[in-house]
């Protein structure tokens, strides 16, 4: 349209430019009203994939068998592994309604037994893989990683990427994490040992990349544990030292602490917002170094991992309680229990008023209070500008 108008203008010195965000006076309010209506109503309800006309359960199972790398498994075995016990309680299944989806006309067994068997198979092969790579780590760490990678949340995420959510036959919709994870476990109960090994290596082991090993196994007293382990290796003296610190009198201080063995060797260092936290993090870093878990650690994936004889690593590693002295606390932190905050607000306010304020003066927001006043040079109404409320520690 603009090109046609420009041609009719001829040689006039006129420039026409279209603005995408230019709206008429009524249109802006209309679009804003539609936006707020959608905010109130919320998102559209989820629609099951099986409700679409191009759904074919048999074809989906055939494609899934090739996608997961086990096309030789029969369709009946897949259906049993993907059938939740609650599926037969659905009204359309109980009433024998024709074309009840997904695939209600086939299979009368559920996956309760396969879930238990598959969970054991997955745990066996995953622990073997972890013992191969983490030979110096205690068995408690191996079990903590195994428990994390095989929980409902992690397995449900893997199942979602594989498209298992659309194939599971269950009463609930949307499908819960527990049902999705149980379907993945049931598949491991159907597969042979070699297929379960490949299933662990191809889909579960890659999740190790996103794991923080210090958070997976949070010891309550890591300094005491690392002290016992170093002394068992011949170290006579263990000492935490402050390497650097900054902002001690600010709201965000930082301390860098290192753990030294025999006053010469730095076995681990880390930073923290307080000395206690920095020592705790440095001790955790020292433990990971002792167990040969570093950022340079190379994990085997794919064919390289499949060629490793993992059957040799069925025996558990050493126990941490055997290496430490009887009085050492080897328990982990229970995050489910509420912990009282160690910060004392009254002490922080008095410290700011007596120490920080005397040294650095007023904060930037207090010195620029006039910048936050209402109104502007255009003298607009108060409805267009809402006065911010800057807050400080004091």
UniProtKB/Swiss-Prot annotation:
InterPro entries the UniProt entry points to: Ribosomal_mL44_DSRM_metazoa, RM44_endonuclase, RNase_III_sf
The keyword Mitochondrion appears for this protein: yes
Record: transit peptide: 1-21
Pfam families found in the cross-reference section: DSRM_MRPL44, RM44_endonuclase
Places the protein is found: Mitochondrion
GO cellular component: mitochondrial large ribosomal subunit; nucleus
Coiled-coil positions: none
Keyword field: Mitochondrion, Ribonucleoprotein, Ribosomal protein, Transit peptide
Domain of life: Eukaryota
Matches recorded under CDD domains: DSRM_MRPL44
Transmembrane segments: none
Molecular function GO terms recorded: double-stranded RNA binding; ribonuclease III activity
One GO BP: mitochondrial translational elongation
Family: Belongs to the ribonuclease III family. Mitochondrion-specific ribosomal protein mL44 subfamily.
Record text on subunit structure and interactions: Component of the mitochondrial large ribosomal subunit (mt-LSU).
Function: Component of the mitochondrial ribosome. May have a function in the assembly/stability of nascent mitochondrial polypeptides exiting the ribosome.
Name used for this protein in its record: Large ribosomal subunit protein mL44
Organism, as annotated: Caenorhabditis elegans
Gene for this chain: mrpl-44
């Amino acid at each position: 349209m603009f090109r046609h108008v420009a041609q009719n203008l001829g040689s006039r010195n006129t420039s026409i430019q279209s603005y995408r965000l230019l709206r008429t006076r009524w249109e802006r309010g209309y679009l804003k009203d539609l936006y707020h209506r959608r905010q109130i109503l919320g998102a559209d309800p989820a629609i099951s994939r099986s409700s679409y006309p191009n759904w074919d359960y048999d074809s989906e199972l055939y494609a899934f068998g090739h996608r997961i790398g086990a096309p030789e498994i029969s369709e009946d075995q897949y259906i049993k592994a993907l059938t939740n016990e609650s599926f037969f309680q659905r009204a359309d299944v109980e009433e024998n309604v024709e074309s009840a989806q997904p695939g209600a006309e086939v299979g009368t067994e559920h996956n309760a037994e396969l879930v238990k068997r598959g969970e054991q198979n997955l745990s066996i092969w995953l622990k073997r893989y972890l013992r191969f790579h983490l030979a110096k780590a205690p068995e408690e760490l191996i079990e903590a990683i195994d428990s994390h990678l095989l929980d409902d949340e992690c397995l449900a995420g893997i199942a979602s990427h594989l498209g298992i959510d659309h194939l599971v036959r269950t009463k609930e919709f949307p499908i819960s994490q527990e049902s999705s994870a149980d379907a993945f476990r049931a598949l491991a109960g159907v597969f042979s040992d070699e297929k379960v090994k490949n299933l662990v290596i191809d889909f579960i082991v890659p999740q190790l990349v996103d794991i923080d090993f210090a958070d997976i196994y949070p010891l309550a007293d890591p300094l005491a544990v690392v002290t016992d382990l170093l002394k068992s290796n011949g170290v006579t003296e263990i000492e935490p030292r402050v390497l650097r610190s900054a902002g001690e009198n600010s709201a965000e201080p930082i301390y860098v602490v290192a753990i030294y063995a025999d006053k010469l060797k730095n076995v681990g260092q880390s930073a923290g917002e307080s000395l206690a936290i920095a020592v705790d993090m440095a001790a955790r870093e020292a433990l990971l170094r002792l167990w040969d878990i570093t950022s340079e650690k190379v994990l085997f994936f794919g064919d390289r991992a499949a060629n490793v004889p993992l059957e040799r690593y069925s025996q558990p590693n050493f126990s941490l309680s055997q290496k430490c002295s009887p009085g050492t606390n080897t328990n982990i932190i229970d995050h489910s229990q509420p912990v009282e905050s160690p910060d004392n607000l009254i002490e922080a306010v008095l410290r700011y008023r007596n120490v920080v304020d005397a040294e650095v003066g007023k904060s930037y927001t207090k010195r620029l209070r006039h910048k936050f006043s209402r109104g502007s040079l255009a003298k607009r109404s108060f409805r267009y500008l809402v006065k911010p409320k800057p807050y400080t520690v004091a």
